[in-house]
Amino acid sequence: MANKQIIDKNDDLQAHTDRNDKPIATIESNHKENKIPDSEKKIVYSTKNLDLWYGENHALKNINLDILENNVTAIIGPSGCGKSTYIKALNRMVELVPSVKTAGKILYRDKNIFDDKHSVEKLRTNVGMVFQQPNPFPKSIYDNITYGPKIHGIKNKKVLDEIVEKSLRGAAIWDELKDRLDTNAYSLSGGQQQRVCIARTLAIEPDVILMDEPTSALDPISTLKVEELVQELKEKYSIIIVTHNMQQAARVSDKTAFFLNGYVNEYDDTDKIFSNPSDKQTEDYISGRFG
């Protein structure tokens, strides 16, 4: 399949682009410069023959997927394809739905997360999550960031102060908020709230960060700041991001998995997915023919 096939579909791309965006296939991926070869990276998550049901609804079907550490992995696909269900399975949040049942394995650092010996609390400490809508607690910025560390037994004020600064710096928002730490987080803008939520996740020092449509409720400027932050965070963390925004997936991710009807339809380097996909359905989706 020639690259020109996708580039020529600019009219179809309008379903997924805003008028200031470049066509997907021509987006430059500056974050991929000096890329470490995949062969030198460890597998952080390995999903093996995973099936998941909500009652009678077969939401995930025979998922096999290896996710590399210190990568940004994008999960894309039309509504209802299973992408949000999948990342919520990665930290067992799907189990909050009473009717859920699973078959198969998800290995996190070579250990099956569904094993009875695997602590859900420890898993969710290692695997943080940022949701679609910013969800700060109705507390001060300081109390939002220190909530997790306090639950884990940290009481020393000096240590907590250091965690707050480190976490807010990690979320690229320290300079904006350092003189407002006693302010209620609800008073912040949507973009600031989302970065505070990211800082709150960083405060517990996770290994993996799951992001479920983290910028869908944000304005373009705030979205850009979060995207830039994602690129910085992957130096220390493995990031898995669900997004409907094709340009965002192309800009920020190293690998992309296209989900369709509960299956992984295609999984490859992001450059290849967006310039020369192997599957016609993948091409049709990223070109705006459906979804």
Swiss-Prot record:
Start and end residues of each stretch annotated as Disordered: 1-21
Keyword presence, Zinc: no
Record keywords: ATP-binding, Cell membrane, Membrane, Nucleotide-binding, Phosphate transport, Translocase, Transport
Membrane topology of the entry: Peripheral membrane protein
Gene3D superfamilies: P-loop containing nucleotide triphosphate hydrolases (3.40.50.300)
Family statement drawn from the similarity comment of this UniProt entry: Belongs to the ABC transporter superfamily. Phosphate importer (TC 3.A.1.7) family.
Protein name: Phosphate import ATP-binding protein PstB
Species of provenance: Staphylococcus saprophyticus subsp. saprophyticus (strain ATCC 15305 / DSM 20229 / NCIMB 8711 / NCTC 7292 / S-41)
